[in-house]
Amino acid sequence: MQILLANPRGFCAGVDRAISIVENALAIYGAPIYVRHEVVHNRYVVDSLRKRGAIFIEQISEVPDGAILIFSAHGVSQAVRNEAKSRDLTVFDATCPLVTKVHMEVARASRRGEESILIGHAGHPEVEGTMGQYSNPEGGMYLVESPEDVWTLNVKNEDKLSFMTQTTLSVDDTSDVIDALRSRFPKIVGPRKDDICYATTNRQEAVRALAEQADVVLVVGSKNSSNSNRLAELAQRMGRRAFLIDDAADIQEAWVKEAVCVGVTAGASAPDILVQNVIARLREFGGGEAVTLEGREENIVFEVPKELRVDVREVE
């Protein structure tokens, strides 16, 4: 059985930054550090940080006065930000800079009183945070997930309308929704390209190349990870058996028993140690040496806040 690895896969710059913010805060200030929502959607990462003293909460009211609070990589609404500001808290923002860029687009539309449409998945924390940047009662903020949603949407003024997208969507699905928006609202204005981030786009491109060669695809990522789910869906659409797994223990031998080639990738919030564990498990099932496919090089780095720019090893 051949083992192929998608390239790129795993951590993106926004996830790296968010985890570093929590790790550095723990090293500098000591436990406990409070984090609103899971800092990234990965069980292994969250459990590891929890063991070191991070406390994950959903409501600001759960944070005691004088504590350190970190916003997750998914971002928060303006209401949450204001609530935190009204409290005696030291706040660090781990929102991915590419999510912040979308927040700024929404805030700009809100100031102008222009209506905005967000393409995204209802209930996802990134969507809640992005929708929460809009506050102008003269305009309006709407969420659509599919072309069908677009055709049933009613707005106040079709001449002053813009759209944005969640950063972790399916590139293909989003293109279909944008086509519907432009057809329904010919004067709608959007970003030069959609707001789907480079890492999401690159990992979908990589899993497409992987699925062309593999007959089974394993996606390492947690069930609540939007970008990981999109990778598994894409492989399935290409006619491959694809499974979303948290770690190597989830793999069932029956999935790969008849496989000639198994492809492995990982969502943007999944650490490489989980991929290595999956490779080891596949080798127990008769897999050979893992071969990494050629792919797009990524060299983007997002800096942590200057107050947290320390060598954690020195602090420890």
Curated annotation (Swiss-Prot):
(2E)-4-hydroxy-3-methylbut-2-enyl diphosphate binds at residues 41, 74, 124, 167, 225-227, 269. Binds 1 [4Fe-4S] cluster per subunit. It is an enzyme of class 1 (oxidoreductase). Transmembrane segments: none annotated. Keywords: 4Fe-4S, Iron, Iron-sulfur, Isoprene biosynthesis, Metal-binding, Oxidoreductase. GO terms for molecular function: 4 iron, 4 sulfur cluster binding; 4-hydroxy-3-methylbut-2-enyl diphosphate reductase activity; metal ion binding. It catalyses: isopentenyl diphosphate + 2 oxidized [2Fe-2S]-[ferredoxin] + H2O = (2E)-4-hydroxy-3-methylbut-2-enyl diphosphate + 2 reduced [2Fe-2S]-[ferredoxin] + 2 H(+); dimethylallyl diphosphate + 2 oxidized [2Fe-2S]-[ferredoxin] + H2O = (2E)-4-hydroxy-3-methylbut-2-enyl diphosphate + 2 reduced [2Fe-2S]-[ferredoxin] + 2 H(+). InterPro entries: LytB/IspH. Isopentenyl diphosphate binds at residues 41, 74, 124, 225-227, 269. Its EC number is 1.17.7.4. Pathway: Isoprenoid biosynthesis; dimethylallyl diphosphate biosynthesis; dimethylallyl diphosphate from (2E)-4-hydroxy-3-methylbutenyl diphosphate: step 1/1; Isoprenoid biosynthesis; isopentenyl diphosphate biosynthesis via DXP pathway; isopentenyl diphosphate from 1-deoxy-D-xylulose 5-phosphate: step 6/6. Dimethylallyl diphosphate binds at residues 41, 74, 124, 225-227, 269. Homodimer. HAMAP family: IspH. NCBIfam families: ispH_lytB, PRK01045.1-2, PRK01045.1-4. Belongs to the IspH family. Catalyzes the conversion of 1-hydroxy-2-methyl-2-(E)-butenyl 4-diphosphate (HMBPP) into a mixture of isopentenyl diphosphate (IPP) and dimethylallyl diphosphate (DMAPP). Acts in the terminal step of the DOXP/MEP pathway for isoprenoid precursor biosynthesis. This is 4-hydroxy-3-methylbut-2-enyl diphosphate reductase.
